[in-house]
Amino acid sequence: MFSKLEAIIRPFKLEEVKVRLMTFGVPGITVTNVMGCGKQIGGIERSKGVEYDSELIEKVKIEIVVMNEHIDELIEIIINAVWTGEIGDGKIFVSPVSSVIRIRTQDKDLDAI
């Protein structure tokens, strides 16, 4: 019935993804600053004028829970917003969600989305 879509993307692509998701009608998103590495290994970073080696790269994680019927469209929206063809474009993970509960009202599933 529901799936959770997690997209790890470059931070500067967040605004474009957010606008496209909201235009599609996604009712809400969770955004978290994360760090990680994969094929795109870190390099020289600067902070307050000091250079240092960084094995982890700053990314942004977007999480949304939607009805399964919308997953393919949302994946396409995200890919179209962030794709450069370069290492580091990110990853999308899709997981099943068995139930959703809004704490304030105790609404469940579709009423809680």
From Swiss-Prot:
Protein name from the UniProt record: Nitrogen regulatory protein P-II
Gene Ontology biological process: regulation of nitrogen utilization
Record flagged with keyword Transcription regulation: yes
Subcellular location: Plastid, Chloroplast
Keywords: Chloroplast, Nucleotide-binding, Phosphoprotein, Plastid, Transcription, Transcription regulation
PROSITE patterns membership: PII_GLNB_CTER, PII_GLNB_DOM
Residues the record lists as O-UMP-tyrosine modifications: Y52
